[in-house]
Amino acid sequence: MKGSRIELGDVTPHNIKQLKRLNQVIFPVSYNDKFYKDVLEVGELAKLAYFNDIAVGAVCCRVDHSQNQKRLYIMTLGCLAPYRRLGIGTKMLNHVLNICEKDGTFDNIYLHVQISNESAIDFYRKFGFEIIETKKNYYKRIEPADAHVLQKNLKVPSGQNAETQKTDN
């Protein structure tokens, strides 16, 4: 698709309805009003994706302080089916990864993926995410209800450096 433009734009009170509509079409789960209220507060961690000026996807994240770590949780990252495999998801995920890299204080980035969503699992694996656990009955009212937790570590564990990791093989 030569000449096509992929851009990311802020989520604002003026376009939050677009985000709601996209999420209703893309995801098998419903998000409540609190989700959308919170999305308006996260700034650069929520973006609409535009393909030639048409909103076709979105990414919404939040900072999570759990397990004595600073983590970034990808609440949603998705794109309308006809616009998949055009680099839109990659642009959204790279945006989030760049934020984490610039910040420098995140330990990891993680998300939940329905166990049957092999294309999403493959997508995240290309970026270095790994399945770290499977949560039984994570989803309500959708089948399969189980979700994989995918995580990408952003910091080398303390006490290790690149040299010791190489020699441990």
Swiss-Prot record:
Acetyl-CoA binds at L77, G78, C79, L80, A81, P82, Y83, R84, R85, L86, G87, I88, G89, T90. The keyword Kinase does not apply. One of its GO terms (biological process) is mitotic sister chromatid cohesion, centromeric. Residues 6-155 form the N-acetyltransferase domain. It catalyses: N-terminal L-methionyl-L-alanyl-[protein] + acetyl-CoA = N-terminal N(alpha)-acetyl-L-methionyl-L-alanyl-[protein] + CoA + H(+); N-terminal L-methionyl-L-seryl-[protein] + acetyl-CoA = N-terminal N(alpha)-acetyl-L-methionyl-L-seryl-[protein] + CoA + H(+); N-terminal L-methionyl-L-valyl-[protein] + acetyl-CoA = N-terminal N(alpha)-acetyl-L-methionyl-L-valyl-[protein] + CoA + H(+); N-terminal L-methionyl-L-threonyl-[protein] + acetyl-CoA = N-terminal N(alpha)-acetyl-L-methionyl-L-threonyl-[protein] + CoA + H(+). It is found in: Cytoplasm; Nucleus. The modification Phosphotyrosine is found at Y110. Substrate binds at Y31, M75. Its EC number is 2.3.1.258, 2.3.1.-. Keywords: Acetylation, Acyltransferase, Cytoplasm, Nucleus, Phosphoprotein, Transferase. CoA binds at N117, E118, S119, A120, I121, D122, F123, Y124, R125, K126. InterPro entries: Acyl_CoA_acyltransferase, GNAT_dom, N-term/lysine_N-AcTrnsfr. The modification Phosphothreonine is found at T12. N-alpha-acetyltransferase that acetylates the N-terminus of proteins that retain their initiating methionine. Has a broad substrate specificity: able to acetylate the initiator methionine of most peptides, except for those with a proline in second position. Also displays N-epsilon-acetyltransferase activity by mediating acetylation of the side chain of specific lysines on proteins. Autoacetylates in vivo. The relevance of N-epsilon-acetyltransferase activity is however unclear: able to acetylate H4 in vitro, but this result has not been confirmed in vivo. Component of the N-terminal acetyltransferase E (NatE) complex at least composed of NAA10, NAA15 and NAA50. Interacts with NAA10. Interacts with NAA15. Predominantly interacts with NAA15 in the N-terminal acetyltransferase A complex (NatA complex); the interactions reduce the acetylation activity of the NatA complex. Component of the N-terminal acetyltransferase E (NatE)/HYPK complex at least composed of NAA10, NAA15, NAA50 and HYPK. Within the complex interacts with NAA15. Its capacity to interact with the NatA complex is reduced by HYPK. Interacts with NAA35. This is N-alpha-acetyltransferase 50. It comes from Mus musculus.
